[in-house]
Every structure is written in structure tokens, then in C-alpha cells.
């Protein structure tokens, strides 16, 4: 399975944890983590939320392939087992984590699924790490590995 995570961030304070789960995931499939942060996004974020969200969408559009999932606090809450079922038997998964202003509603609606990891607003760096852990957990569930007890 091909797993793609597209995100927007300047730095990664959770890099050690992200690397740990990336390595574990590689036992089950191919993982690509792509940071699309660029100068246009940096400038747009200094203007306003509307321009920032537009710049995020422009950066993400070329990567919409496979089964596409937006990470969104207004998305659907799933248990780890439900998440494992959702991603099971997919050839390619693409996850989109918005920047500081989130994602435009129109972009979210254009994807296959909207996933909420929490009703709380979370730092996007933390969301990526949490998502990696849940992807690994889902692979373990789907492969009867004892990580998920």
C-alpha cells in the first residue's frame, strides 16, 4: 500500500516520534511525507485566513490521488478499529493536513473522507505524528499484530 501524507509546516518539533512511526509503517507499505510549505504560503498566511487557505489548496491540488482523506476537526470521529477498516484494501491513501488556518470547506468536500482525530484544535505538527501512530496501529489491526491490544 502507498501512503502519502501532505502537510504544511515550518519545523517539526515531533521529528523523533514521526521518524519512529514512519519506520514502523514501512514494514507494511510505502510511506511518503511531503511538506508543501513554500514562499507563497508564507506570504498568504501573513495576509489573512482566506488567502492562506487558498494557497494551501493550490499546493495540495497536484497530489489528489488515491483515496483522499482530509484531517479536519469537523470530520468524522472513528475508533482505531473503524479507521483500520476504512483504510483496509486501499491501494493508495493520501492524507491532507492543513496549515495554521485549516482547509477550505470546498477542498474538504472534494476529498473522499474527512477524519477528525479530536474535536480539539491541534497543532498540525502534532496531528501528523498522531496520524502516523494511527496508521501504524491500523496496519497492526489489519495484520493481527499485537501492538493494538
Curated annotation (Swiss-Prot):
<keyword id="KW-0489">Methyltransferase</keyword>
<dbReference type="InterPro" id="IPR029028">
    <property type="entry name" value="Alpha/beta_knot_MTases"/>
</dbReference>
<protein>
    <recommendedName>
        <fullName>Ribosomal RNA large subunit methyltransferase H</fullName>
        <ecNumber>2.1.1.177</ecNumber>
    </recommendedName>
</protein>
<feature type="binding site">
    <location>
        <position position="98"/>
    </location>
    <ligand>
        <name>S-adenosyl-L-methionine</name>
    </ligand>
</feature>
<keyword id="KW-0963">Cytoplasm</keyword>
<dbReference type="GO" id="GO:0005737">
    <property type="term" value="C:cytoplasm"/>
</dbReference>
<comment type="similarity">
    <text>Belongs to the RNA methyltransferase RlmH family.</text>
</comment>
<comment type="subunit">
    <text>Homodimer.</text>
</comment>
<feature type="binding site">
    <location>
        <begin position="117"/>
        <end position="122"/>
    </location>
    <ligand>
        <name>S-adenosyl-L-methionine</name>
    </ligand>
</feature>
<keyword id="KW-0808">Transferase</keyword>
<keyword id="KW-0698">rRNA processing</keyword>
<dbReference type="InterPro" id="IPR029026">
    <property type="entry name" value="tRNA_m1G_MTases_N"/>
</dbReference>
<dbReference type="Pfam" id="PF02590">
    <property type="entry name" value="SPOUT_MTase"/>
</dbReference>
<keyword id="KW-0949">S-adenosyl-L-methionine</keyword>
<dbReference type="GO" id="GO:0070038">
    <property type="term" value="F:rRNA (pseudouridine-N3-)-methyltransferase activity"/>
</dbReference>
<feature type="binding site">
    <location>
        <position position="71"/>
    </location>
    <ligand>
        <name>S-adenosyl-L-methionine</name>
    </ligand>
</feature>
<dbReference type="InterPro" id="IPR003742">
    <property type="entry name" value="RlmH-like"/>
</dbReference>
<comment type="function">
    <text>Specifically methylates the pseudouridine at position 1915 (m3Psi1915) in 23S rRNA.</text>
</comment>
